[in-house]
Amino acid sequence: MTVTRGLEGVVATSSSVSSIIDDTLTYAGYNIDDLTENASFEEVVYLLWHRQLPTASQLKELKQQLADNADLPQAILDYFNMYPIEKVHPMAALRTAVSQLALFDEEADTMDSEANYRKAVRLQAKLPTIVASFARIRKGLSPVAPRKDLSFAANFLYMLDGKEPDVIAEEAMNKALILHADHELNASTFTARVCVATLSDVYSGVTAAIGALKGPLHGGANEAVMKMLTEIGTPENVDSYIREKLVKKEKIMGFGHRVYRQGDPRAKHLKLMSEKLTKLTGQPQWYDMSIKIENIVTGEKKLPPNVDFYSASMYHSLGIDHDLFTPIFAVSRVSGWLAHILEQYDNNRLIRPRAEYTGPGMQVYVPVEKRQEL
């Protein structure tokens, strides 16, 4: 057998959801640059699920469906109050809440395509409510009920702090949600597909995906970037901090990518929003530090920034808690997970790869009383 560690370069399935070709990311044939500058997140959700952009009436219907399904069962909110809040990472709370949602859905184990689509709508609608509600409850604040008159991005920000966001904040969140919505066969998406390929339910697939996204090598990088920026403190400290890490051969979070060779096409959009927001909020040091870090790392290591690098300072400028960065990733990426889950169901085959055995050769059983300690 030939082993490909990390399955790098292995084509494991075919998909019509998104593609990465020659460092260009597209959703169902639409360039990510085009979508980020022109579309709403709701349009992108529809695109990922249907492989075409919605008409005005189709978009209105989806928005209404999302608004109608955004509320959480009271029991989920009650469970949040039972968690050891000071110890629970929001990703763990999100993973648990999504699994619990299945208990309140009468269609949880109904596997026809129409029921699966309805569950997709419910999950897409409820994830931002879960994240925002937990974020407030752990601070001793009451959850903010979702509003039906706001966009998906604006409503998410509104539920987080109870204030209707301004146009710039809404634009920033909308762009971030679009940019994180799907990314071909990444670790969490592959996890979701492996799970539902067993014909497990939609909730199980999304719960498994959240578990994969929780890992720092996948979804936690922007939180690590913000931790690094906080440790650096000021632009004047960047040079010594980064060069010391490079000398020690320590990883600089937010740079390089397994798939992209010339640079992550999503990063430039977040870089622009980071610059705009940090200046508008009177916190230009976060962007200034990021620029200095980028110049050193790209110059010394030839590694361009990825989607995680500038999203950190952008989210921070929006006043979002650092440990919510990865849950926000999930709020967006669930749209892609659901698209892949529905696609897997439509043309399913159990995913069962092989492993090269590297253990001992054939051995003979020895009774326990005759075994010698090594």
Protein language model features and the residues they cover:
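Non-transmembrane, aqueous-exposed alpha-helical and coiled segments at domain scale
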Residues: 1-374
